[in-house]
Curated annotation (Swiss-Prot):
It comes from Dichelobacter nodosus (strain VCS1703A). The keyword DNA repair applies. Disulfide bonds: none annotated. The keyword DNA repair applies. This is DNA mismatch repair protein MutL. One of its GO terms (molecular function) is ATP hydrolysis activity. Residues 335-351 have a biased composition (Polar residues). The gene is mutL. Gene3D superfamilies: 3.30.230.10, Histidine kinase-like ATPase, C-terminal domain, MutL, C-terminal domain, dimerisation subdomain, MutL, C-terminal domain, regulatory subdomain. PANTHER family: DNA MISMATCH REPAIR PROTEIN MLH, PMS, MUTL (PTHR10073), DNA MISMATCH REPAIR PROTEIN MLH1 (PTHR10073:SF12). GO terms for cellular component: mismatch repair complex. One of its GO terms (biological process) is mismatch repair. Keywords: DNA damage, DNA repair. It comes from the Bacteria.
Length: 590
């Protein structure tokens, strides 16, 4: 058996680097956090080959004293904490004192720093084993990391393409810029400016990273509970993304990724967005540092909350309440060109007209008396016309107004006090039915049923049979009942609201979907998804013609429905075109 030996310091640092330094973005994270902890508000980052050849960061922070420079590259040397109590209430981004030592062990690192009280700067290059030397540098620090992983080639093989590594760096800088203000960070690669994030205020930083569209398609939230404060912006349920790269969550200004928080946010958006879409948000949670453990992971990206359930419930309830009170925004219209509208091009000679044309030639020339009579009639002034009395226009105070008609049997057009409302009648009806189903289940625990005059037979697949055996009792709470004769499933009752729907297709889909939710803890989610699909089956369809009274009833129901701004899949249910937008469409007032 091999003897147990102490590892050399260089190898210890390289092992530590394996936990902390995964890629160039990991290096950037550590040195940027050190700069922020030093009070820097302006950072300039330069890279080459997406950071594998060069990472250089200059800041305007407080700098490092000469006598501390060498110690800064020593393992577990830090100015951030002194005791266990400090660790349990740490508020700085860095605190372990191992980042610089780890970085220097796998790269060629040079650090130059100057404090306000120093006459000049001092420079140190650990890989050269040279003494600290004087240098020219304004107050602040510049750290230069060259040839990352030069002495650990196996690690270098795991790096991705320059494009991917650069993407990770830009994502990191976006998150850091969002976390504080005033703050500005720029990124250059080979003398080319890649980005500049930040601003004098948090909203300026938000705009620089997320853009104007996010500000227009999000709501700002503020909530407090038992010492926790939540602030930020969440995207509308109709404004989502295919990936999760537009999600930023900060705990005490530290960008983190937490499963507990992710679950709370996802649950808050449940039944408002499509399952394959992801919400966009920038959220800041502030709480006592003693209530969150930031020392749970080497990269400090994951945290542990000491009151996990309380934190989860606070996040969920705050977001859920805000999201369900959202009203759709005014429609975003593409500006019209000032040029005259283009008329349809004339048809070719072979084109067939839609209507029979009146001949332009006469069978005979008009007689003289006919021509004279026409001339006299044309010269006679028209009789005076008394205008018909106009009905008094009543002010429309209903939020969604009064229905005017349908477009293509798909959209309801209504007029309200602000202007024009356009409603997607299927999406709107779907949301109405969904909330009604949920309300009945919540209050009565049993959906009203309709017994079928003619029971409907259905041949079940093995998967559907298993679902029926496992969840049969629960299915009956949704309003379904059945009997089985000679292995044939015969449907006897359905939810009363589905009596006019394709019940065979619905029950088949329900049983199939239940196979995807085998755990009892997931039944709530399964129930909501199944109800959503049932409502989708029952809701009015495109090209269903409704009377004006039916349209108005749908509008009134929608006005009293929670989360009425979008259907269960995240599509808008209605949009508002105000008078200003309508004027702009016709170039009025220009």
């Amino acid at each position: 058996m091999a003897k147990i030996l102490l590892l050399p310091p260089a190898l210890i640092n390289q092992i530590a680097a394996g936990e902390v330094i995964e890629r160039p973005a990991s290096v950037v994270k550590e040195i940027v956090e050190n700069a922020i902890d030093a009070g820097a508000t302006r950072l300039a980052l330069e890279i080459e080959a997406a950071g594998s050849k060069l990472i250089r960061l200059s800041d305007n922070g407080s700098g490092i004293e000469k006598e501390d420079l060498a110690l800064a590259f020593t393992t577990h040397a830090t100015s951030k904490i002194r005791t266990l109590e400090d660790l349990e209430q740490v508020s700085s981004l860095g605190f372990r004192g191992e980042a610089l030592a780890s970085i220097a062990s796998i790269s060629k690192t040079t650090l130059t720093s100057c404090t306000q009280s120093s006459d000049h700067a001092w420079k140190i290059s650990p890989h050269l084993n040279e003494n600290i030397t004087p240098a020219a540098h304004p107050q602040g620090t510049t750290i230069e990391i060259r040839d990352l992983f030069y002495n650990t080639p196996a690690r270098k093989k795991f790096l991705r393409s320059d494009r991917t590594e650069r993407y990770h760096i830009t994502q990191l800088l976006a998150g850091i810029a969002l976390s504080r203000a005033p703050f500005v960070i720029t990124l250059h690669e080979q003398d080319r400016k890649i980005l500049e994030y930040g601003g004098k205020t948090l909203k300026e930083s938000l705009k620089s990273v997320m853009g104007d569209e996010f500000l227009a398609q999000s709501i700002e939230i503020q909530a407090e509970h038992e010492g926790m404060h939540l602030h930020g912006w969440v995207g509308l349920p109709t404004y989502t993304h295919q990936q999760t790269d537009k999600q930023y969550f900060f705990v005490n200004q530290r960008l983190v990724s937490d499963k507990l928080v992710a679950h709370a946010i996802k649950q808050a958006y449940e039944d408002m967005i499509h399952r394959q879409r992801h919400p966009i948000f920038v959220l800041f949670l502030t709480l006592d540092p003693a209530l969150v453990d930031v020392n749970a992971h080497p990269s400090k990206r994951e945290v542990r909350f000491r009151q996990a359930q309380l934190t989860h419930d606070f996040m969920f309830s705050s977001l859920h309440r805000a999201l369900r009170n959202i009203q759709p925004r005014a429609a975003q219209l593409t500006p019209l060109s000032s040029a005259s509208p283009k008329l349809p091009e004339s048809t070719t000679a072979t084109a067939q007209p839609h209507h029979k044309m009146i001949p332009h030639t006469f069978a005979r020339p008009p007689r003289l008396q006919e021509t004279k009579a026409y001339y006299q009639w044309a010269q006679t002034p028209p009789p005076a016309v008394t205008p018909a009395p106009q009905p008094e226009i009543k002010k429309i105070n209903l939020p969604l107004g009064q229905a005017l008609g349908q477009i293509h049997g798909t959209f309801i057009v209504a007029e309200n006090a602000q202007g024009l409302v356009v409603v997607d009648m299927h999406a709107a009806h779907e949301r109405i039915l969904y909330e009604q189903f949920k309300s009945v289940l919540k209050t009565q625990k049993q959906i009203p049923v309709q017994r079928l005059l003619l029971p409907l037979p259905l041949t079940l697949t093995p998967v559907q049979q298993d679902s029926l055996a496992q969840h049969g009792a629960w299915l009956k709470t949704l309003g379904f009942d059945w009997t089985i004769n000679d292995k044939e499933f015969i449907l006897l009752t359905v939810p009363a609201r589905l009596k006019n729907s394709d019940c065979i297709s619905i029950i088949g889909d329900v049983l199939q979907e239940l196979s995807e939710f085998p755990k009892s803890t997931q039944l709530q989610r399964a129930q909501e998804q199944i109800i959503a699909n049932m409502c989708c089956h029952q809701a009015v369809r495109a090209h269903d013609l409704l009377s004006i009274s039916e349209m108005n009833q749908l509008l009134r129901d929608l006005e009293t429905t929670p989360a009425a701004g979008q259907c269960n899949h995240g599509r808008p249910t209605w949009i508002q075109l105000d008078a200003t937008q309508l004027d702009a469409l016709f170039l009025r007032g220009q």
